[in-house]
Amino acid sequence: MTERRALQVRLREVREEDLPSFFSYQSDPAAAVMAGFVPRDAEADAAHWHRIATDPMVIARTIVVENEVAGSIVSFGNEQERNLGYWISSAFWGKGTATRAAELFLQIETTRPLYAHVLKTNIGSQRVLAEIGFIPFDSDSEEFVVVLRQ
């Protein structure tokens, strides 16, 4: 019997050298389907991260696992409605990475309520959000909107 070792997950400020990893992860066809997302080309992705870096209403962190860039996590919106989003490399799916990263991020982003949108087909992300305290708020034919009130 093999023991499963807990991965060391930490967050840090986004660095320019993280961006190629982020681009690669959002280009993964399986991840794009899971998130209901059309991958950006390199130029559009660079512009996206430039907007994030220069928007005072965005909090962004790099998710690092065992010294490897595993993804990103952000909050965005305005003072009345803040949203949570994250993108995890498929190499880290199912290992608790998103849950731990979100737990850590919620210590940084303390605005409540905090909302998240998740596709109805993205069971993994639904589980992550439920584990960290998000509850159903609204839905449409394709997605759930969940909220963290406290």
Predicted segment positions?
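Acyl-donor (CoA/ACP) binding surface of acyl/acetyltransferases
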Residues: M1-P20, S24-M34, A60-Q150
